[in-house]
UniProtKB/Swiss-Prot annotation:
Acidic residues bias: start-end ranges: 317-327
Physiological role: Involved in cell division and chromosome segregation. Plays a central role in the initiation of sporulation through the activation of multiple components of the cell division machinery. Acts as a transcriptional regulator that is involved in the direct control of genes required for key steps in sporulation, including the cessation of aerial growth, the initiation of cell division, and chromosome segregation. Functions almost equally as an activator and as a repressor. Required for DNA binding by WhiB. May function cooperatively with WhiB.
GO biological process terms on file: cell division; regulation of sporulation
Paired cysteines (S-S): none
A GO MF label: DNA binding
Protein family according to the UniProt entry: Belongs to the WhiA family.
Induction: Autoregulated. Expressed throughout vegetative growth and sporulation. Could be post-translationally regulated.
Residue ranges of the annotated DNA-binding region, renumbered to this chain: 273-306
Gene name per UniProt: whiA
Organism, as annotated: Streptomyces venezuelae (strain ATCC 10712 / CBS 650.69 / DSM 40230 / JCM 4526 / NBRC 13096 / PD 04745)
Protein name as it appears in the record: Probable cell division protein WhiA
Pfam families: HTH_WhiA, LAGLIDADG_WhiA, WhiA_N
Amino acid sequence: MTAAVKDEISRLPVTRTCCRKAEVSSILRFAGGLHLVSGRIVIEAELDTAMAARRLKRDILEIFGHSSELIVMAPGGLRRGSRFVVRVVAGGDQLARQTGLVDGRGRPIRGLPPQVVSGATCDAEAAWRGAFLAHGSLTEPGRSSSLEVTCPGPEAALALVGAARRLSIAAKAREVRGVDRVVVRDGDAIGALLTRLGAHESVLAWEERRMRREVRATANRLANFDDANLRRSARAAVAAGARVQRALEILGEEVPEHLAAAGRLRMEHKQASLEELGALADPPLTKDAVAGRIRRLLAMADKRAQDLGIPGTESNLTEELDDSLVG
């Protein structure tokens, strides 16, 4: 899915100048390098998609006023696909200062430039967009799903973690075999970050694959009922569904919508776990929140039934399910 995300965000229109500057600065930091050629600074950025390279070349010209050349490197050696190098020779030293690759005295800046680090939320989004275009990857949803960016050093990694924090997204910096990386593993956080990057089509595709995988995993668990604990959990879930059905009958239109929604989820997915119900909720809920809402729904219905002198929620239980508990 990495290629799909990069293709989509390479086509994303960005109009605010500060965001375009932040994106260029980030791409040059994560995909680029400074070289001294005949005493002059030459800037190079190596990308794996032509669309991202053309976007960078255009923005360098339109925002910073510098021409660049685009060099295509054919596959060979360890490279499976073509690589695209954007090179700035004339004005390289000036561009290095403009984008925060070096400070006013010409000393290299290891992380992201101050104007990006302390910028607005849109600058943090742009920094992540640039970093992902430069060296990002997204794995398929599953146990080891992750969104990851390879970083040029620990300072850049920490700056990217800080940018994620400003977007309320948990990311971790780690060093693996001498390479600094920033990783986002939580499924919800990955979806939120992709949305922030502007990869809306990719978010839908990723979430759909994630949901299909979870449904398959649930089906496999339900098909393998050798484990007694799993059987008890499933019976308890079915029992809760039966009690919820009776609760909704008792309360009718008096039930609060958020409790009714939790109850309907329990009825529609009788053998799902509370965690799975939470993932199906809109917006998603924790398993404790789902359990709490179902408990309140049943308690409200049983109190109402007692006041009216009619059978409560447990009247819907068969003998087999009579001892089961919610979820």
